[in-house]
Amino acid sequence: MAHYKAADSKREQFRRYLEKSGVLDTLTKVLVALYEEPEKPNSALDFLKHHLGAATPENPEIELLRLELAEMKEKYEAIVEENKKLKTKLAQYEPPQEEKRAE
């Protein structure tokens, strides 16, 4: 009987933890939103993931990574543009490919 009470006590502690941290409230809201959807989505799991993801605050590291990605994209575009210009310049000094083969 003591084993049963210990398991029950752990469950109750876990339930209180979920309640205090807002997990139960958030899950309930998302499930109610799914229930109230006039047209049910094909994937209920995707619906839950999307709505739960929107409910959690952004990790600051994610924003830093987004900024870094934007910077890298800009650098990439600049390098691609520079590469095009250098290829054009180089083409002026090199004979066309067909002339090279004839030699």
Swiss-Prot record:
One example GO MF annotation: transcription coactivator activity
Highest rank taxon of the organism: Eukaryota
Swiss-Prot/TrEMBL keywords: Cytoplasm, Nucleus, Transcription, Transcription regulation
Gene3D superfamilies xref list: 6.10.250.1060
Chief location: cytoplasm
Classification via InterPro entries: AMY1 (IPR026060)
Subcellular location: Cytoplasm; Nucleus
CC terms in the record's Gene Ontology section: cytoplasm; nucleus
Cystine bridges: none
One BP term from GO: regulation of DNA-templated transcription
Protein purpose: May control the transcriptional activity of MYC. Stimulates the activation of E box-dependent transcription by MYC.
Subunit (UniProt): Binds via its C-terminal region to the N-terminal region of MYC. Associates with AKAP1/S-AKAP84. Interacts with MYCBPAP. Interacts with CFAP91.
Family: Belongs to the AMY1 family.
Protein name listed in UniProt: c-Myc-binding protein
Origin species: Bos taurus
Upper lineage: Eukaryota, Metazoa, Chordata, Craniata, Vertebrata
Protein encoded by which gene: MYCBP
